[in-house]
Amino acid sequence: MTVSRLLKDRVRYAPYLKKVKPVEELIPLFKDGQYIGWSGFTGVGAPKAVPEALIKHVEENNLQGKLRFNLFVGASAGPEECKWAEHDMILRRAPHQVGKPIAKAINDGRIQFFDKHLSMFPQDLTYGYYSRNRTDGKILDYTIIEATAIKEDGSIVPGPSVGGSPEFISVSDKIIIEVNTATPSFEGLHDIDMPVNPPFRQPYPYTAVDQKNGLDSIPVDPERVVAVVESTQRDVVGPNTPSDATSQSIARHLVEFFENEVRHGRLPENLHPLQSGIGNIANAVIEGLTDSSFKNLTVWTEVLQDSFLDLFENGALDYATATSIRLTEAGFQKFFDNWDDFSKKLCLRSQVVSNNPELIRRLGVIAMNTPVEVDIYAHANSTNVSGSRMLNGLGGSADFLRNAKLSIMHAPAARPTKTDPTGISTIVPMASHVDQTEHDLDVLVTDQGLADLRGLSPRERAREIIKNCAHPDYQPILTDYLDRSEHYAKLHKCMHEPHMLKNAFKFHLNLSEKGTMKVDNWD
Protein backbone atom coordinates (compact mmCIF):
# COMPACT_ATOMS: atom_id res chain seq x y z
CA MET A 1 0.00 0.00 0.00
CA THR A 2 1.24 3.50 -0.87
CA VAL A 3 1.92 5.58 2.23
CA SER A 4 1.19 9.30 1.91
CA ARG A 5 3.91 11.85 2.55
CA LEU A 6 1.90 13.33 5.41
CA LEU A 7 1.63 9.93 7.09
CA LYS A 8 5.36 9.27 6.66
CA ASP A 9 6.10 12.60 8.34
CA ARG A 10 3.90 11.73 11.33
CA VAL A 11 5.03 8.10 11.80
CA ARG A 12 8.64 8.28 12.97
CA TYR A 13 8.83 4.61 14.00
CA ALA A 14 9.75 2.86 10.75
CA PRO A 15 8.36 -0.64 11.55
CA TYR A 16 4.85 0.85 11.79
CA LEU A 17 5.01 1.98 8.17
CA LYS A 18 4.93 -1.71 7.23
CA LYS A 19 1.66 -2.03 9.15
CA VAL A 20 -0.16 0.73 7.27
CA LYS A 21 -3.33 -0.76 5.80
CA PRO A 22 -6.44 0.42 4.00
CA VAL A 23 -9.27 0.53 6.48
CA GLU A 24 -11.33 -1.99 4.49
CA GLU A 25 -8.80 -4.73 5.24
CA LEU A 26 -9.52 -4.43 8.96
CA ILE A 27 -13.22 -5.31 8.77
CA PRO A 28 -12.70 -9.11 9.16
CA LEU A 29 -10.98 -8.50 12.51
CA PHE A 30 -14.25 -7.44 14.12
CA LYS A 31 -16.72 -10.01 15.45
CA ASP A 32 -20.07 -9.76 17.18
CA GLY A 33 -19.81 -9.37 20.97
CA GLN A 34 -16.22 -8.12 21.10
CA TYR A 35 -15.01 -5.66 23.74
CA ILE A 36 -13.74 -2.50 22.06
CA GLY A 37 -11.97 0.55 23.47
CA TRP A 38 -11.90 3.92 21.73
CA SER A 39 -9.81 6.96 22.41
CA GLY A 40 -11.69 10.23 22.80
CA PHE A 41 -13.30 12.43 25.41
CA THR A 42 -16.24 14.85 25.03
CA GLY A 43 -16.46 14.37 21.29
CA VAL A 44 -12.83 15.00 20.31
CA GLY A 45 -9.87 12.69 19.76
CA ALA A 46 -11.99 9.63 18.95
CA PRO A 47 -11.24 7.29 16.02
CA LYS A 48 -13.12 8.02 12.82
CA ALA A 49 -11.93 5.93 9.87
CA VAL A 50 -12.40 2.45 11.36
CA PRO A 51 -15.79 3.15 13.00
CA GLU A 52 -17.06 4.68 9.73
CA ALA A 53 -15.83 1.67 7.74
CA LEU A 54 -17.68 -0.66 10.09
CA ILE A 55 -20.86 1.39 9.67
CA LYS A 56 -20.55 1.06 5.89
CA HIS A 57 -19.98 -2.70 6.25
CA VAL A 58 -23.11 -3.08 8.39
CA GLU A 59 -25.20 -1.02 5.97
CA GLU A 60 -24.07 -2.90 2.87
CA ASN A 61 -24.58 -6.33 4.43
CA ASN A 62 -27.75 -5.68 6.46
CA LEU A 63 -25.97 -6.55 9.69
CA GLN A 64 -27.93 -4.19 11.93
CA GLY A 65 -28.29 -5.95 15.30
CA LYS A 66 -25.97 -8.75 14.16
CA LEU A 67 -22.61 -7.04 14.64
CA ARG A 68 -22.74 -5.47 18.10
CA PHE A 69 -19.94 -4.44 20.42
CA ASN A 70 -19.28 -3.69 24.06
CA LEU A 71 -17.97 -0.16 23.61
CA PHE A 72 -15.83 1.64 26.17
CA VAL A 73 -14.68 5.25 25.77
CA GLY A 74 -13.23 7.63 28.36
CA ALA A 75 -16.41 9.70 28.16
CA SER A 76 -18.45 10.66 25.09
CA ALA A 77 -17.04 10.04 21.61
CA GLY A 78 -17.81 11.78 18.33
CA PRO A 79 -20.78 11.43 15.96
CA GLU A 80 -19.59 7.93 15.03
CA GLU A 81 -20.98 6.43 18.24
CA CYS A 82 -24.39 7.90 17.45
CA LYS A 83 -24.24 6.26 14.00
CA TRP A 84 -23.28 2.98 15.69
CA ALA A 85 -26.37 3.34 17.89
CA GLU A 86 -28.57 4.06 14.86
CA HIS A 87 -27.27 0.88 13.21
CA ASP A 88 -27.78 -1.20 16.37
CA MET A 89 -24.05 -1.83 16.70
CA ILE A 90 -23.70 -1.22 20.45
CA LEU A 91 -24.51 -3.97 22.91
CA ARG A 92 -23.11 -2.27 26.01
CA ARG A 93 -21.74 1.24 26.58
CA ALA A 94 -19.93 3.02 29.40
CA PRO A 95 -19.37 5.42 31.13
CA HIS A 96 -20.78 8.58 29.46
CA GLN A 97 -22.42 9.45 26.16
CA VAL A 98 -23.86 12.44 24.33
CA GLY A 99 -26.26 12.35 21.41
CA LYS A 100 -29.96 11.75 20.82
CA PRO A 101 -29.61 8.42 18.92
CA ILE A 102 -27.54 6.73 21.61
CA ALA A 103 -29.64 8.16 24.46
CA LYS A 104 -32.78 6.95 22.67
CA ALA A 105 -31.34 3.46 22.28
CA ILE A 106 -30.45 3.39 25.98
CA ASN A 107 -33.90 4.52 27.06
CA ASP A 108 -35.55 2.11 24.60
CA GLY A 109 -33.63 -0.67 26.34
CA ARG A 110 -31.54 -1.61 23.27
CA ILE A 111 -28.19 -0.61 24.81
CA GLN A 112 -27.08 -1.72 28.26
CA PHE A 113 -25.51 1.46 29.63
CA PHE A 114 -23.82 2.12 32.93
CA ASP A 115 -22.28 5.36 34.07
CA LYS A 116 -19.40 5.60 36.49
CA HIS A 117 -17.23 8.27 38.09
CA LEU A 118 -14.80 9.19 35.32
CA SER A 119 -11.83 9.07 37.69
CA MET A 120 -12.63 5.44 38.48
CA PHE A 121 -13.83 4.04 35.16
CA PRO A 122 -10.46 3.42 33.43
CA GLN A 123 -8.84 1.84 36.49
CA ASP A 124 -11.86 -0.38 37.15
CA LEU A 125 -11.68 -1.54 33.55
CA THR A 126 -8.01 -2.52 34.03
CA TYR A 127 -9.03 -4.50 37.14
CA GLY A 128 -11.20 -6.67 34.88
CA TYR A 129 -14.44 -5.58 36.54
CA TYR A 130 -16.24 -5.03 33.22
CA SER A 131 -15.06 -8.22 31.54
CA ARG A 132 -15.43 -10.65 34.45
CA ASN A 133 -17.88 -12.85 32.52
CA ARG A 134 -15.34 -13.57 29.77
CA THR A 135 -13.80 -17.02 29.72
CA ASP A 136 -10.70 -16.16 27.68
CA GLY A 137 -9.09 -13.88 30.28
CA LYS A 138 -9.07 -10.85 27.97
CA ILE A 139 -10.29 -7.38 28.93
CA LEU A 140 -10.41 -5.58 25.57
CA ASP A 141 -10.15 -7.29 22.19
CA TYR A 142 -9.18 -4.11 20.34
CA THR A 143 -8.43 -0.52 21.20
CA ILE A 144 -8.75 1.93 18.32
CA ILE A 145 -6.81 5.05 19.18
CA GLU A 146 -6.40 8.30 17.31
CA ALA A 147 -2.85 9.67 17.20
CA THR A 148 -1.50 12.90 15.79
CA ALA A 149 2.06 11.52 15.68
CA ILE A 150 4.06 8.39 16.49
CA LYS A 151 7.46 8.92 18.06
CA GLU A 152 10.73 7.12 17.27
CA ASP A 153 10.10 4.56 20.04
CA GLY A 154 6.64 3.69 18.72
CA SER A 155 4.79 5.58 21.44
CA ILE A 156 1.58 7.40 20.57
CA VAL A 157 1.07 11.16 20.67
CA PRO A 158 -2.67 11.69 21.21
CA GLY A 159 -4.69 14.56 19.82
CA PRO A 160 -6.98 16.98 21.66
CA SER A 161 -7.91 14.45 24.36
CA VAL A 162 -6.28 11.78 26.50
CA GLY A 163 -9.22 10.34 28.45
CA GLY A 164 -8.83 6.64 29.23
CA SER A 165 -6.48 5.81 26.35
CA PRO A 166 -3.45 4.88 28.50
CA GLU A 167 -5.49 2.35 30.47
CA PHE A 168 -7.23 0.95 27.38
CA ILE A 169 -3.90 0.41 25.63
CA SER A 170 -2.39 -1.25 28.68
CA VAL A 171 -5.03 -4.02 28.74
CA SER A 172 -5.95 -4.36 25.06
CA ASP A 173 -5.15 -7.59 23.24
CA LYS A 174 -4.63 -5.78 19.93
CA ILE A 175 -4.30 -2.11 19.01
CA ILE A 176 -5.21 -0.18 15.87
CA ILE A 177 -3.73 3.29 15.50
CA GLU A 178 -5.49 5.93 13.41
CA VAL A 179 -3.00 8.66 12.59
CA ASN A 180 -4.95 11.83 11.88
CA THR A 181 -3.06 13.84 9.28
CA ALA A 182 -5.86 16.38 8.87
CA THR A 183 -5.08 18.00 12.22
CA PRO A 184 -1.72 19.37 13.37
CA SER A 185 0.35 17.29 15.76
CA PHE A 186 -0.32 17.92 19.46
CA GLU A 187 3.15 16.75 20.45
CA GLY A 188 4.43 18.41 23.62
CA LEU A 189 1.00 19.13 25.07
CA HIS A 190 0.49 15.93 27.07
CA ASP A 191 1.56 14.62 30.45
CA ILE A 192 0.77 10.91 30.66
CA ASP A 193 0.79 8.83 33.83
CA MET A 194 0.62 5.16 32.92
CA PRO A 195 -1.57 2.93 35.10
CA VAL A 196 -0.06 1.11 38.07
CA ASN A 197 -2.40 -1.10 40.09
CA PRO A 198 -2.43 -1.47 43.87
CA PRO A 199 -0.48 -2.28 45.96
CA PHE A 200 2.30 -0.80 43.82
CA ARG A 201 0.64 2.53 43.03
CA GLN A 202 2.49 5.68 44.11
CA PRO A 203 0.99 9.12 44.88
CA TYR A 204 0.58 11.49 41.95
CA PRO A 205 3.24 14.14 42.71
CA TYR A 206 1.40 17.23 41.48
CA THR A 207 1.12 20.17 43.88
CA ALA A 208 0.46 22.87 41.27
CA VAL A 209 -1.64 23.06 38.12
CA ASP A 210 1.36 23.55 35.83
CA GLN A 211 3.51 20.68 37.13
CA LYS A 212 4.46 17.90 34.74
CA ASN A 213 5.95 14.61 35.83
CA GLY A 214 4.74 12.03 33.32
CA LEU A 215 5.45 11.10 29.71
CA ASP A 216 4.62 13.20 26.67
CA SER A 217 3.28 10.17 24.77
CA ILE A 218 1.59 6.83 25.46
CA PRO A 219 3.93 3.79 25.43
CA VAL A 220 2.70 0.77 23.50
CA ASP A 221 4.03 -2.70 22.79
CA PRO A 222 4.65 -2.67 19.00
CA GLU A 223 3.86 -6.40 18.84
CA ARG A 224 0.25 -5.66 19.79
CA VAL A 225 -0.19 -3.02 17.09
CA VAL A 226 -1.89 -4.87 14.23
CA ALA A 227 -2.51 -1.93 11.90
CA VAL A 228 -1.91 1.74 11.28
CA VAL A 229 -4.59 3.65 9.36
CA GLU A 230 -4.47 7.18 8.02
CA SER A 231 -7.39 9.35 9.08
CA THR A 232 -8.12 12.56 7.21
CA GLN A 233 -11.14 13.91 9.08
CA ARG A 234 -10.94 16.59 11.75
CA ASP A 235 -13.08 16.61 14.86
CA VAL A 236 -16.44 18.27 14.29
CA VAL A 237 -17.73 20.22 17.29
CA GLY A 238 -20.91 22.22 16.91
CA PRO A 239 -21.13 25.87 17.92
CA ASN A 240 -21.28 26.54 21.64
CA THR A 241 -24.65 27.47 23.05
CA PRO A 242 -24.44 31.23 23.54
CA SER A 243 -25.02 32.70 26.96
CA ASP A 244 -28.39 34.32 27.58
CA ALA A 245 -29.93 36.54 30.25
CA THR A 246 -30.54 33.57 32.55
CA SER A 247 -27.00 32.19 32.38
CA GLN A 248 -25.52 35.69 32.62
CA SER A 249 -27.51 36.28 35.80
CA ILE A 250 -26.11 33.05 37.27
CA ALA A 251 -22.60 34.18 36.33
CA ARG A 252 -23.10 37.55 38.04
CA HIS A 253 -24.22 35.87 41.27
CA LEU A 254 -21.15 33.63 41.18
CA VAL A 255 -18.67 36.42 40.49
CA GLU A 256 -20.17 38.45 43.35
CA PHE A 257 -19.86 35.41 45.62
CA PHE A 258 -16.19 34.96 44.70
CA GLU A 259 -15.51 38.65 45.33
CA ASN A 260 -17.14 38.36 48.75
CA GLU A 261 -15.10 35.26 49.61
CA VAL A 262 -11.92 37.16 48.72
CA ARG A 263 -12.96 40.14 50.87
CA HIS A 264 -13.49 37.83 53.84
CA GLY A 265 -10.18 36.03 53.36
CA ARG A 266 -11.66 32.66 52.47
CA LEU A 267 -10.20 32.76 48.96
CA PRO A 268 -7.01 34.35 47.61
CA GLU A 269 -7.27 37.14 45.05
CA ASN A 270 -6.59 34.72 42.20
CA LEU A 271 -9.10 32.24 43.67
CA HIS A 272 -8.18 28.54 43.50
CA PRO A 273 -8.01 26.31 40.41
CA LEU A 274 -11.35 26.35 38.62
CA GLN A 275 -13.31 23.40 37.26
CA SER A 276 -16.21 24.11 34.96
CA GLY A 277 -18.50 21.85 32.97
CA ILE A 278 -19.80 22.48 29.46
CA GLY A 279 -22.90 24.28 28.23
CA ASN A 280 -24.19 27.83 28.11
CA ILE A 281 -24.10 28.35 31.89
CA ALA A 282 -20.48 27.22 32.08
CA ASN A 283 -19.66 29.51 29.15
CA ALA A 284 -21.43 32.42 30.84
CA VAL A 285 -19.45 31.86 34.04
CA ILE A 286 -16.17 31.94 32.12
CA GLU A 287 -17.35 35.04 30.26
CA GLY A 288 -18.18 36.61 33.63
CA LEU A 289 -14.68 35.87 34.88
CA THR A 290 -13.24 37.29 31.65
CA ASP A 291 -15.01 40.58 32.36
CA SER A 292 -14.17 40.57 36.09
CA SER A 293 -11.15 41.93 37.93
CA PHE A 294 -9.75 38.47 38.71
CA LYS A 295 -6.25 37.83 37.35
CA ASN A 296 -3.64 35.05 37.48
CA LEU A 297 -6.36 32.41 37.44
CA THR A 298 -5.65 28.72 37.00
CA VAL A 299 -7.84 25.87 35.79
CA TRP A 300 -7.89 22.18 36.75
CA THR A 301 -10.77 20.64 34.86
CA GLU A 302 -11.95 17.91 32.49
CA VAL A 303 -12.75 19.93 29.39
CA LEU A 304 -11.66 23.27 27.96
CA GLN A 305 -14.02 25.15 25.64
CA ASP A 306 -13.59 28.19 23.41
CA SER A 307 -14.36 30.60 26.24
CA PHE A 308 -11.14 29.61 28.01
CA LEU A 309 -9.14 30.89 25.05
CA ASP A 310 -10.61 34.34 25.73
CA LEU A 311 -9.41 34.08 29.34
CA PHE A 312 -5.93 33.26 28.06
CA GLU A 313 -5.97 36.12 25.55
CA ASN A 314 -7.00 38.82 28.01
CA GLY A 315 -4.28 37.74 30.44
CA ALA A 316 -6.62 36.59 33.22
CA LEU A 317 -5.72 32.88 32.93
CA ASP A 318 -2.16 31.75 33.67
CA TYR A 319 -2.40 27.98 33.16
CA ALA A 320 -4.96 25.23 32.51
CA THR A 321 -4.94 21.47 32.92
CA ALA A 322 -7.62 19.23 31.38
CA THR A 323 -8.05 15.87 29.72
CA SER A 324 -9.75 17.32 26.62
CA ILE A 325 -9.78 20.49 24.52
CA ARG A 326 -13.25 20.58 23.02
CA LEU A 327 -13.10 23.50 20.63
CA THR A 328 -15.28 24.56 17.73
CA GLU A 329 -13.74 24.81 14.27
CA ALA A 330 -13.06 28.50 14.87
CA GLY A 331 -11.69 27.72 18.32
CA PHE A 332 -9.27 25.11 17.01
CA GLN A 333 -8.14 27.52 14.29
CA LYS A 334 -7.44 30.19 16.90
CA PHE A 335 -5.64 27.59 19.01
CA PHE A 336 -3.39 26.45 16.15
CA ASP A 337 -2.73 30.02 14.97
CA ASN A 338 -1.47 30.86 18.46
CA TRP A 339 0.15 27.49 19.23
CA ASP A 340 3.40 28.92 20.61
CA ASP A 341 1.51 30.98 23.18
CA PHE A 342 -1.32 28.61 24.14
CA SER A 343 0.80 25.44 24.26
CA LYS A 344 3.00 26.92 27.01
CA LYS A 345 -0.04 27.43 29.23
CA LEU A 346 -1.85 24.16 28.73
CA CYS A 347 -1.46 20.50 29.67
CA LEU A 348 -3.57 17.49 28.72
CA ARG A 349 -3.55 14.60 31.22
CA SER A 350 -5.23 11.23 31.64
CA GLN A 351 -8.76 11.44 33.06
CA VAL A 352 -7.68 9.42 36.11
CA VAL A 353 -5.37 12.37 36.90
CA SER A 354 -7.54 15.31 35.83
CA ASN A 355 -10.42 13.86 37.87
CA ASN A 356 -8.37 12.37 40.69
CA PRO A 357 -10.13 13.05 44.02
CA GLU A 358 -6.92 13.40 46.02
CA LEU A 359 -5.48 15.95 43.59
CA ILE A 360 -8.74 17.90 43.47
CA ARG A 361 -8.72 18.13 47.26
CA ARG A 362 -4.98 18.91 47.46
CA LEU A 363 -5.23 21.77 44.97
CA GLY A 364 -8.40 23.21 46.53
CA VAL A 365 -10.34 23.19 43.28
CA ILE A 366 -13.51 25.27 42.91
CA ALA A 367 -15.99 22.96 41.16
CA MET A 368 -18.98 24.24 39.16
CA ASN A 369 -21.46 21.87 37.51
CA THR A 370 -25.05 21.86 36.23
CA PRO A 371 -27.69 19.47 37.61
CA VAL A 372 -31.03 18.29 36.26
CA GLU A 373 -32.70 19.14 39.56
CA VAL A 374 -31.88 19.82 43.20
CA ASP A 375 -34.22 19.19 46.10
CA ILE A 376 -34.90 21.51 49.01
CA TYR A 377 -32.28 19.74 51.14
CA ALA A 378 -29.56 19.95 48.42
CA HIS A 379 -29.57 16.44 47.00
CA ALA A 380 -28.79 16.76 43.29
CA ASN A 381 -29.81 14.72 40.26
CA SER A 382 -27.39 15.02 37.34
CA THR A 383 -28.47 12.12 35.15
CA ASN A 384 -32.04 10.80 35.15
CA VAL A 385 -35.02 12.95 34.18
CA SER A 386 -37.98 12.12 36.43
CA GLY A 387 -35.84 9.43 37.97
CA SER A 388 -35.80 7.13 34.93
CA ARG A 389 -34.81 8.72 31.61
CA MET A 390 -31.04 8.79 31.15
CA LEU A 391 -29.53 11.93 29.69
CA ASN A 392 -25.75 11.56 29.34
CA GLY A 393 -24.35 9.99 32.49
CA LEU A 394 -22.69 11.08 35.70
CA GLY A 395 -19.45 12.18 34.08
CA GLY A 396 -16.93 13.74 36.40
CA SER A 397 -19.28 15.96 38.36
CA ALA A 398 -19.14 13.83 41.51
CA ASP A 399 -15.35 13.45 41.26
CA PHE A 400 -15.12 17.20 41.64
CA LEU A 401 -18.12 18.03 43.83
CA ARG A 402 -17.28 15.48 46.51
CA ASN A 403 -13.66 16.64 46.78
CA ALA A 404 -13.52 20.33 45.84
CA LYS A 405 -12.78 23.12 48.30
CA LEU A 406 -15.92 24.81 47.03
CA SER A 407 -18.63 22.62 45.48
CA ILE A 408 -21.06 24.69 43.41
CA MET A 409 -24.05 23.71 41.30
CA HIS A 410 -25.74 26.15 38.94
CA ALA A 411 -28.93 25.92 36.89
CA PRO A 412 -31.86 28.04 35.72
CA ALA A 413 -34.56 28.22 38.38
CA ALA A 414 -37.19 27.01 35.92
CA ARG A 415 -37.38 25.51 32.43
CA PRO A 416 -40.22 25.55 29.90
CA THR A 417 -42.56 22.76 28.88
CA LYS A 418 -44.74 22.73 25.76
CA THR A 419 -47.59 24.39 27.66
CA ASP A 420 -45.92 26.35 30.46
CA PRO A 421 -42.89 28.67 30.14
CA THR A 422 -41.91 27.87 33.74
CA GLY A 423 -43.39 24.38 33.85
CA ILE A 424 -40.30 22.64 35.25
CA SER A 425 -38.81 23.76 38.55
CA THR A 426 -35.15 22.96 39.12
CA ILE A 427 -35.86 23.05 42.87
CA VAL A 428 -38.12 20.13 43.84
CA PRO A 429 -39.34 18.71 47.17
CA MET A 430 -37.38 15.48 46.73
CA ALA A 431 -34.91 14.64 43.96
CA SER A 432 -36.23 11.82 41.77
CA HIS A 433 -32.69 10.42 41.51
CA VAL A 434 -29.63 11.30 43.60
CA ASP A 435 -26.11 11.59 42.19
CA GLN A 436 -24.70 14.17 44.62
CA THR A 437 -25.90 14.08 48.20
CA GLU A 438 -26.65 16.92 50.61
CA HIS A 439 -23.17 16.33 52.04
CA ASP A 440 -21.47 17.25 48.74
CA LEU A 441 -22.82 20.72 47.92
CA ASP A 442 -21.64 24.03 49.36
CA VAL A 443 -23.35 26.53 47.10
CA LEU A 444 -26.41 26.47 44.84
CA VAL A 445 -26.97 29.18 42.23
CA THR A 446 -29.85 29.94 39.90
CA ASP A 447 -30.77 33.06 37.96
CA GLN A 448 -32.87 34.03 41.00
CA GLY A 449 -29.97 34.09 43.45
CA LEU A 450 -27.35 32.18 45.40
CA ALA A 451 -27.75 29.97 48.46
CA ASP A 452 -24.66 29.49 50.63
CA LEU A 453 -25.33 26.13 52.30
CA ARG A 454 -22.11 25.75 54.26
CA GLY A 455 -22.71 24.76 57.86
CA LEU A 456 -26.50 24.83 57.63
CA SER A 457 -28.84 22.17 58.98
CA PRO A 458 -31.23 20.54 56.48
CA ARG A 459 -34.18 22.73 57.48
CA GLU A 460 -32.02 25.86 57.29
CA ARG A 461 -30.81 24.77 53.85
CA ALA A 462 -34.37 24.28 52.67
CA ARG A 463 -35.42 27.83 53.64
CA GLU A 464 -32.30 29.30 52.05
CA ILE A 465 -32.73 27.37 48.80
CA ILE A 466 -36.43 28.21 48.45
CA LYS A 467 -35.88 31.89 49.29
CA ASN A 468 -32.82 32.48 47.10
CA CYS A 469 -32.93 29.91 44.29
CA ALA A 470 -36.50 28.81 43.56
CA HIS A 471 -38.45 30.56 40.81
CA PRO A 472 -41.09 32.97 42.19
CA ASP A 473 -43.82 30.78 40.66
CA TYR A 474 -42.68 27.92 42.89
CA GLN A 475 -41.60 29.67 46.09
CA PRO A 476 -45.05 29.61 47.75
CA ILE A 477 -45.69 26.02 46.63
CA LEU A 478 -42.36 24.80 48.01
CA THR A 479 -42.74 26.82 51.21
CA ASP A 480 -46.17 25.25 51.75
CA TYR A 481 -44.67 21.79 51.25
CA LEU A 482 -41.93 22.52 53.78
CA ASP A 483 -44.36 23.99 56.33
CA ARG A 484 -46.65 20.98 56.08
CA SER A 485 -43.72 18.58 56.25
CA GLU A 486 -42.41 20.27 59.39
CA HIS A 487 -45.86 20.12 61.00
CA TYR A 488 -46.11 16.41 60.25
CA ALA A 489 -42.52 15.73 61.36
CA LYS A 490 -43.00 17.58 64.64
CA LEU A 491 -45.95 15.36 65.51
CA HIS A 492 -43.86 12.26 64.80
CA LYS A 493 -40.62 13.59 66.33
CA CYS A 494 -38.59 13.37 63.09
CA MET A 495 -37.70 17.01 62.52
CA HIS A 496 -34.19 16.59 61.13
CA GLU A 497 -35.17 16.44 57.45
CA PRO A 498 -38.97 16.67 57.18
CA HIS A 499 -40.83 15.15 54.25
CA MET A 500 -44.35 14.16 53.31
CA LEU A 501 -43.54 10.95 51.47
CA LYS A 502 -47.01 10.69 49.93
CA ASN A 503 -46.39 14.06 48.22
CA ALA A 504 -42.62 14.04 47.77
CA PHE A 505 -42.81 13.36 44.02
CA LYS A 506 -46.03 15.24 43.31
CA PHE A 507 -44.11 17.78 41.20
CA HIS A 508 -42.96 14.99 38.88
CA LEU A 509 -46.36 13.29 38.74
CA ASN A 510 -48.08 16.58 37.97
CA LEU A 511 -45.54 17.26 35.20
CA SER A 512 -46.28 13.87 33.64
CA GLU A 513 -50.05 14.29 33.86
CA LYS A 514 -50.55 18.02 33.27
CA GLY A 515 -47.36 19.32 31.65
CA THR A 516 -46.35 21.48 34.62
CA MET A 517 -44.91 21.05 38.10
CA LYS A 518 -47.29 23.68 39.50
CA VAL A 519 -49.42 21.54 41.78
CA ASP A 520 -52.79 22.94 42.83
CA ASN A 521 -52.41 21.84 46.44
CA TRP A 522 -50.75 19.25 48.70
CA ASP A 523 -54.00 17.64 49.92
Curated annotation (Swiss-Prot):
Record's Gene3D superfamilies?
4-hydroxybutyrate coenzyme like domains, Acetyl-CoA hydrolase/transferase C-terminal domain, Glutaconate Coenzyme A-transferase
Q: Which cysteines are joined by disulfide bonds?
A: none
GO BP: any one term = acetate metabolic process
Native species: Kluyveromyces lactis (strain ATCC 8585 / CBS 2359 / DSM 70799 / NBRC 1267 / NRRL Y-1140 / WM37)
Coiled-coil residues are none
Keyword annotations: Cytoplasm, Hydrolase
Q: Where are the transmembrane segments?
A: none
- Its gene name is ACH1
- Record family assignment: Belongs to the acetyl-CoA hydrolase/transferase family.
Can you name one GO molecular function term for this protein? acetate CoA-transferase activity
* Reaction equation(s) it catalyzes: acetyl-CoA + H2O = acetate + CoA + H(+)
Question: What GO cellular component is one of the record's annotations?
Answer: mitochondrion
Query: Where on the tree of life does the source sit, at the highest rank?
Result: Eukaryota
Residues reported in the UniProt entry to bind CoA = G277, I278, G279, N280, I281, N392, G396
Protein name in the entry: Acetyl-CoA hydrolase
